[in-house]
Amino acid sequence: MKLLCWNIRGFGNLGRRRQLIDYIRQEDINIVGLQETVRQDFSIQELQGLSRHPFAWQWLPASGQSGGILLGVREDFFSVEDMDRGEFFLSMAITDRRVNLSWEVIIVYGPADHGRLAAFLTELQDKVERCTFPVVVAGDFNLIRTEADKSSPNIVRRRMRMFNDAIAAMALREIARVGARFTWTNKQ
């Protein structure tokens, strides 16, 4: 199973969309979670064109010129049991058709405005607590867990502590990411 999670910074950017299509097809991606789509809506043709396989899609519209989440799962691999959304997340409860294992994938896009940090973490904790299946939470949290996650020395330890406390309260474990260390590098 392969999950692609990417802050695409604008689904309308043709170069990024071409990269997305190529990656989904070359790597045979089963789950797609995009943040910062900067889109209100998607056409069926756009979504069908992303993969050679059928996907179930849902999206959270952008707020003006920022935000937006797109989540899709391959329908030949997964049956979708339920979908949910909040201000900062989209989720699908899915069952893997091959092994009959049910779990929930939650894609988040945390607020860049750290004044909304408490609302984001509270919403995420409430969502995880309501889950009846094991969960995978992925996305752009707009937060860091350690000083090594930051490229500059400007670190707000209070936010880092809040994030780590929330992760501990949800009993989540971090999965090492693959790819560029920072999403804004030239190897997007």
Locations of the language-model features?
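A shared catalytic/ligand-binding motif for oxyanion handling
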Residues: 1-188
